[in-house]
Amino acid sequence: MGSNSFGRLFTVTTFGESHGPAIGCVIDGCPPGLEIAPEEFTHDLQRRATGKSRHTSARREADEIEILSGVYEGRTTGTPIGLLIRNTDQRSKDYTNIAQQFRPGHADYTYWQKYGIRDPRGGGRSSARETTMRVAAGVIAKKWLKQRYGVLVRGFLSQLGEIRPSGFDWDAVEDNPFFWPHAAQVPELETYMDALRKSGDSVGARVDVVAGGVPPGWGEPIYGKLDSELAAALMSINAVKGVEIGDGFASAAQKGTEHRDLITPEGFLSNHAGGILGGISTGQAVTASMVLKPTSSLRLPGATVDADGAVVDVITTGRHDPCVGIRATPIAEAMMALVLMDQALRHRAQCGDVGEVSPLIPGQADV
């Protein structure tokens, strides 16, 4: 299999390349009756889009959704939903000089080794352009989760280079181009990114994503664990090199008396586990974070070889993000929502007759 599909009951298959005529996806398994209109995709697609600030790629795509199937008179029918976005701002000439060169840190060499052929324009299938359709599918999952269970999925940039938030306010996240949770630091980020862009270099980042209102019981033991599927989903995003659930790698320095989340009738006293125990949701907020590497598309020369094995210096002159993490928040939200919707449907299919089990420990009221 080509591994272009995701999910078990709620499945998403994406297609298309960065500089092809269009990108799209097919969503199967969506319950019927969900109201959805093309304009509902706009908000999240624009949050992910390039060209919205000087700190992201200058490529400007309209990202207008066409609903091809699976929706009738504004409601899902239960049949496959086809979504399409036409590419309109490709600049393939930017890649003519490096079409036969393997850019260090990119998928050029690995795609060449696997397939014996590759589309060099904008990275082809390995481009982050593909994530546009994940965000589109995530719009449907987010809406269904919110309407059916009251689940709210949202994220924020929790590290840019060596800079971390010195305060936190969810309201601040949507009021700046960085999805940064502390408004007072935004000028510092602007200055940092301006200097980075002028230097021609790039930098890594970290994104946190949180789902509040997830009921207990979602997830399956062993091979269908909620945290394992969430980790795989986040790791599938371009440039992601590490994922944590809850306290993640910080758990290595903790003692059991610190890490265990004590339980009272009024609720859990902490959430080091990230809302998941034994692969199954606890009713607390599901929390995860992902680390994205610095983009390797740089104006600074780097040593590599070409398709003939000759040693060359490669310089990428196309339009690229100096920090891919800046636009990654809505992508992380989408992937978490897709995992949660798939797990919710699977839980309902197997355990729908179980009902509410006592005692029910309250989750967090606000995340």
Swiss-Prot record:
GO terms, biological process:
amino acid biosynthetic process; aromatic amino acid family biosynthetic process; chorismate biosynthetic process
Listed as disulfide-bonded, the cysteine pairs are none
Q: What is its EC number?
A: 4.2.3.5
Reaction(s) catalysed (UniProt annotation)? 5-O-(1-carboxyvinyl)-3-phosphoshikimate = chorismate + phosphate
The cofactor note reads:
Reduced FMN (FMNH(2)).
Determine the domain of life of the protein's source.
Answer: Bacteria
List the GO molecular function terms: chorismate synthase activity; FMN binding
User: Which InterPro entries does this entry report, sorted A to Z?
Assistant: Chorismate_synth, Chorismate_synth_AroC_sf, Chorismate_synthase_CS
Q: Which UniProt keywords apply?
A: Amino-acid biosynthesis, Aromatic amino acid biosynthesis, FAD, Flavoprotein, FMN, Lyase, NADP
Q: Which pathway, metabolic or otherwise, does it act in?
A: Metabolic intermediate biosynthesis; chorismate biosynthesis; chorismate from D-erythrose 4-phosphate and phosphoenolpyruvate: step 7/7
Q: Which residues form a coiled coil?
A: none
Requisite cofactors: FMNH2
List cellular component terms (GO).
cytosol
Is Nucleotide-binding one of the keywords?
no
- One of this protein's Pfam families, by short name? Chorismate_synt
Q: Which residues bind FMN?
A: R125, S126, S127, N238, A239, G278, K293, P294, T295, S296, S297, R319
Keyword Amino-acid biosynthesis: yes or no?
yes
Cited PROSITE patterns = CHORISMATE_SYNTHASE_1 (PS00787), CHORISMATE_SYNTHASE_2 (PS00788), CHORISMATE_SYNTHASE_3 (PS00789)
Fetch the NCBIfam families from UniProt: aroC (TIGR00033), PRK05382.1 (NF003793)
Record function comment: This reaction introduces a second double bond into the aromatic ring system.
Assembly and partners?
Homotetramer.
Protein family according to the UniProt entry:
Belongs to the chorismate synthase family.
Protein name per its UniProtKB record: Chorismate synthase
